[in-house]
Amino acid sequence: MQLILTTGGTGVALRDVTPEAVREIAIRELPGFGEIMRIESMKITKNAILSRNLAAIVDKALVICLPGKPSGAVECLSFVAGAIPHCIEVLQEVPTSC
C-alpha cells in the first residue's frame, strides 16, 4: 500500500483522534501538507483554522488525514494532489531526477 487516505476525526471535538492515532504509528510527519490544506481551506471557511489535517509516513506509505465532510475532503486532497506522486516515488525508492 502506497497511499492511505483517512476521512474524519480531524476536528477539535474530544472524539476526534485521527491525528493522534496516526502520529502513534508514523515514522515521520510531513507538516507542509497540513499547512497547505489549512491555508487553502481558510479561503473557503474561517473555521478551517480549527482543522488538524496532517500527512505522515507509516512504513513506506503516505498517510493523509482529511476532514470528514465530503466536500472538505475533496477540496483538501486537491490542494496537495500535486505533491503526492513524487512523495510516493521517493518512499518507494523509485529513481527520480531530483
Regions found by a protein language model. Name each.
Residues 1-98:
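Non-catalytic beta/alpha edge segments that cap or flank active sites
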